[in-house]
Every structure is written in structure tokens, then in C-alpha cells.
Amino acid sequence: MNVCTFTLVLALVGSVSGQYYDYDAPLFMYGELSPNCAPECNCPHSYPTAMYCDDLKLKSVPMVPPGIKYLYLRNNQIDHIDEKAFENVTDLQWLILDHNLLENSKIKGKVFSKLKQLKKLHINYNNLTESVGPLPKSLQDLQLANNKISKLGSFDGLVNLTFIYLQHNQLKEEAVSASLKGLKSLEYLDLSFNQMSKLPAGLPTSLLTLYLDNNKITNIPDEYFNRFTGLQYLRLSHNELADSGVPGNSFNISSLLELDLSYNKLKSIPTVNENLENYYLEVNKLEKFDVKSFCKILGPLSYSKIKHLRLDGNPLTQSSLPPDMYECLRVANEITVN
């Protein structure tokens, strides 16, 4: 099947995607090493509160001297954390432990909750089977992706927690529903690549970004997303959604800017709000284009704000698109169709 892209105005240069959050190391120039540093690690003199211990084949957390606020321990062989590992640095703010061998049973006591200034805790790519805890109230960013997590502990009292990354785990909807409902500051939640067959109940209504792609979700409860009055980015691609499992106004959310429903089993285009800008519907079973899915009425001031629309990989063809589509989607930059 040949796929062609036709442009209504001008094709945007660059890719279109949702909101991703990139937390790189603090920016600085490497220079003379600080004397306040573990001998096997790197503490640049120009940024003396950061200690880099990446790629050293460490089997345990090294001695961390007082004054360190940003600690990087990526790509090692650390398989345990003693309860006293961070006693000298109770004002630690970032703790990055990605790509190690950590298991829950070998993370001792209240090693994290003692860090009263901790804002970022990253333990991606380890061997965790449940979430870690207890955690300090100061925590803003928790990343536990690419583990084997099937159980979430309590997140009670984490009033500042804003970002949670749980993709590529073994979570089912029951585990999620029981743990996250009290997080009133949560804005970003990634639950993609898990084992959910239903949408989890009780997710925080404060969410701006919600990723649920690559699960086994078959239906959406009526008015499920209406509670999320600020939701902007929603991904449900690579699930098992069919028309019978999607109530008529499931995605008619005025705040929504991007919706990804690609790689499902939809035969008709779900109705969306006129404020939506990016809509991904490729590789479904769409047979017709209904303008009313985008525009309830047409007029000089009534039109869709869609900029990018993907319809390729469906039975729908360019020749079957209705003429009034162009009036409804008048500000679109790019529409991709077979």
C-alpha cells in the first residue's frame, strides 16, 4: 500500500510529538576536580555539588562527602543500598541510579525518606518488583521505568510529586488505582508498556500528560476523561479499542492538544473538541471521514484547530474525503492518508 502525504498549507519541518521532560545533568564546563569527592568519582571544580560515579562497575554506593547535592551512579553493578549510605548528605537533591542491579529487598530501611531535600529519584533499568519507599515529601520526580514492577506501595503525603515514570513494567490496573489517587500535584504519568486491560480508576485529576499506550485496554468508561479538566496530552495507541468500547464523547475535552489512538481497531473517528491540534489515527480500520467528528457546525469562526492529522494505514482513501473537510480543517498543516 502506497502512502502519500498531501499538504493543505505547508508541511511543518520537524517531528510532532507530545510533551517529554528531559532532565539532563546540570550544565557546566568540566575542569579541575573538587577535593570534596569520592576518589573513584568525578566532582568538577566548576560544579562542586555534583558527583559523577557513572560507568565504574561499582557494586555498592561509594562514600558520599558532605555538600554533594547531585549524585549520579548510572551504569554500574550496584545491587544494594545500606540504610546509612547517604547519612553524610541529607541535603541531597538528585539521586540517579539508572542501569544497576537493585532489588527491593536490598534497599534498606528508610534510606530515601531521610533525604528531606530530595527532588529527583531515578531508578530506571533495575530489578525492582514494586515501587520503593518510604519517600520524602520533597520528592517531585520519580522514575522507575524498565523494571519488573507489579505492585505499587503507598504514595501518601507526597504533596510535591509531579512526575511519575512507570513505563515498561508489569502493572495491572488494580495496582495503579489503589496507589495514585491521592497525588494532588501529579501532572505527568507514564504507564505505557504495562499489562492493563482497563483504565485505572481514581487517577489524579491534576494530570496534564497521561500515556497509556501499549497496554491491552479494550474500552473507556463513559465520561472517564471528563474529570481531567487540564489534560493536554493523551496516548492510547497500541491497545485494543474498538468502536463499541469508545463512548461518543470520550475525547471531547476542551483542554486536549494531542490525542494518539493509532494502532487500535476503530472503524469510525471518535469525536474530539475543536481545540485539539494533533490527532493520530493511523493503522485502525477507518472506513469513512465524518466532518462532525471535528466540527459540530461550520462557519467563519467555527472550525477545528487540527494542525496534524494521521489517517494512513486505514481503508479510508484520499478520494473518499468529503469536500467540506477542507473548510473544517482549514488551519491544518499536514494530513496523511492512503
From Swiss-Prot:
<feature type="repeat" description="LRR 8">
    <location>
        <begin position="230"/>
        <end position="250"/>
    </location>
</feature>
<dbReference type="GO" id="GO:1904010">
    <property type="term" value="P:response to Aroclor 1254"/>
</dbReference>
<comment type="similarity">
    <text>Belongs to the small leucine-rich proteoglycan (SLRP) family. SLRP class II subfamily.</text>
</comment>
<feature type="modified residue" description="Phosphoserine">
    <location>
        <position position="304"/>
    </location>
</feature>
<keyword id="KW-0732">Signal</keyword>
<dbReference type="GO" id="GO:0051216">
    <property type="term" value="P:cartilage development"/>
</dbReference>
<dbReference type="GO" id="GO:0032914">
    <property type="term" value="P:positive regulation of transforming growth factor beta1 production"/>
</dbReference>
<keyword id="KW-1015">Disulfide bond</keyword>
<feature type="repeat" description="LRR 4">
    <location>
        <begin position="138"/>
        <end position="159"/>
    </location>
</feature>
<keyword id="KW-0677">Repeat</keyword>
<dbReference type="InterPro" id="IPR032675">
    <property type="entry name" value="LRR_dom_sf"/>
</dbReference>
<feature type="modified residue" description="Sulfotyrosine">
    <location>
        <position position="30"/>
    </location>
</feature>
<feature type="glycosylation site" description="N-linked (GlcNAc...) (keratan sulfate) asparagine">
    <location>
        <position position="127"/>
    </location>
</feature>
<dbReference type="GO" id="GO:0005583">
    <property type="term" value="C:fibrillar collagen trimer"/>
</dbReference>
<comment type="subunit">
    <text>Binds to laminin.</text>
</comment>
<feature type="repeat" description="LRR 6">
    <location>
        <begin position="185"/>
        <end position="205"/>
    </location>
</feature>
<feature type="glycosylation site" description="N-linked (GlcNAc...) (keratan sulfate) asparagine">
    <location>
        <position position="88"/>
    </location>
</feature>
<feature type="disulfide bond">
    <location>
        <begin position="295"/>
        <end position="328"/>
    </location>
</feature>
<dbReference type="Pfam" id="PF01462">
    <property type="entry name" value="LRRNT"/>
</dbReference>
<feature type="glycosylation site" description="N-linked (GlcNAc...) (keratan sulfate) asparagine">
    <location>
        <position position="252"/>
    </location>
</feature>
<keyword id="KW-0272">Extracellular matrix</keyword>
<feature type="repeat" description="LRR 7">
    <location>
        <begin position="206"/>
        <end position="227"/>
    </location>
</feature>
<feature type="modified residue" description="Sulfotyrosine">
    <location>
        <position position="21"/>
    </location>
</feature>
<feature type="repeat" description="LRR 9">
    <location>
        <begin position="255"/>
        <end position="276"/>
    </location>
</feature>
<feature type="repeat" description="LRR 5">
    <location>
        <begin position="160"/>
        <end position="181"/>
    </location>
</feature>
<dbReference type="InterPro" id="IPR001611">
    <property type="entry name" value="Leu-rich_rpt"/>
</dbReference>
<dbReference type="GO" id="GO:0005518">
    <property type="term" value="F:collagen binding"/>
</dbReference>
<feature type="repeat" description="LRR 3">
    <location>
        <begin position="117"/>
        <end position="137"/>
    </location>
</feature>
<dbReference type="GO" id="GO:0045944">
    <property type="term" value="P:positive regulation of transcription by RNA polymerase II"/>
</dbReference>
<keyword id="KW-0433">Leucine-rich repeat</keyword>
<dbReference type="InterPro" id="IPR000372">
    <property type="entry name" value="LRRNT"/>
</dbReference>
<keyword id="KW-0765">Sulfation</keyword>
<dbReference type="GO" id="GO:0031012">
    <property type="term" value="C:extracellular matrix"/>
</dbReference>
<feature type="repeat" description="LRR 2">
    <location>
        <begin position="91"/>
        <end position="114"/>
    </location>
</feature>
<feature type="modified residue" description="Sulfotyrosine">
    <location>
        <position position="23"/>
    </location>
</feature>
<dbReference type="Pfam" id="PF13855">
    <property type="entry name" value="LRR_8"/>
</dbReference>
<keyword id="KW-0964">Secreted</keyword>
<feature type="repeat" description="LRR 11">
    <location>
        <begin position="305"/>
        <end position="326"/>
    </location>
</feature>
<feature type="signal peptide">
    <location>
        <begin position="1"/>
        <end position="18"/>
    </location>
</feature>
<protein>
    <recommendedName>
        <fullName>Lumican</fullName>
    </recommendedName>
</protein>
<dbReference type="Pfam" id="PF00560">
    <property type="entry name" value="LRR_1"/>
</dbReference>
<dbReference type="GO" id="GO:0070848">
    <property type="term" value="P:response to growth factor"/>
</dbReference>
